[in-house]
Amino acid sequence: QKEVRRLILTCSGGPFFGMTREELAGKTKDDALKHPNWKMGPKITVDCATLMNKGLEVIEAMRLYGLPLEQVTAIIHRQSVIHSLVEFVDGAVMAQLGVPDMRIPIGLAMTYPARLHNPAPALDLLACGNLNFAEIDEAAFPCFALAKQAARIGGTACAAMNAANEAAVARY
């Protein structure tokens, strides 16, 4: 942990990437369920559209690795090729890359340090093209900012925020 400068999680930005808060006002449930890169259930797809999923993942990473919020962040990566990165104190960055298929990072998390066969296709680096990144617009995606605020508060704030999100998505 003392060798880690920061942990960087990535997200695609969902179907609403690049929109302002005003543009998001009229979006429907059907709009939220049109994820550009992943096929998932409706609850997680809505969480991806609001970036609440990334806020929850930041909290999870903090707790899993014992890192403060200042060392865990998230950025937008539309191609969904890079799933996460670790920046070390010497400036080196290690990234977990793969095709946009969650079986790869989930399998890695569940079997590490072992390496088991995964049916997901291999990543063709030459076919990837450019890999682009953007900052998360917390004004347009206040759920991400809310999750970070809950992480700062600590205690039961994260659980309360998660419960409120569950109820809100169920009503959406």
Predicted regions and their residues:
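Catalytic, metal-anchored helix/loop core of enzyme active sites in primary metabolism
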Residues: 1-172
